């Protein structure tokens, strides 16, 4: 299954999920980007980074993201949102909640879901949102995550067991080839 990024979303959002004539390629939805990576300090955090000033980046404006999500919902397309930081994950959950309007069967996903607060973690199950988490990121981030988050927030990262215990569907396949 494939997802179109925002630049190629128009066709998916006008026609809905599609399969090519050979049946080999399926486009099920769109992929958006809420924030950047933790290593570069681009992940959107609720509190400043522990090792530098700043809260990270918000890459998709709210009005644009919500409009695309509502169109996706209307045509039955899935949405995958890249969100790494706790602020990025919270905003994504807020937008999903608004766009889905109570539909818990849409199978929308948050790609990475690396840093999630105790308050937001159960919202994944409540909203039917899949946490698509890549184990290789925990290994790759091992050397800088403690410095970026500080010891007080480190427990909010890489929460596979917490997600499973909360009844969240976790997908552990690799979303891309950024971490080898």
Identify the residue ranges that each predicted region occupies.
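His/Asp/Glu-enriched, well-ordered alpha-helical/loop segment
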Residues: 69-108, 112-113, 118-122, 130-180
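Metal-coordinating catalytic core of metallo-dependent amide/deamination hydrolases
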Residues: 1-86, 90, 123-130, 135-136
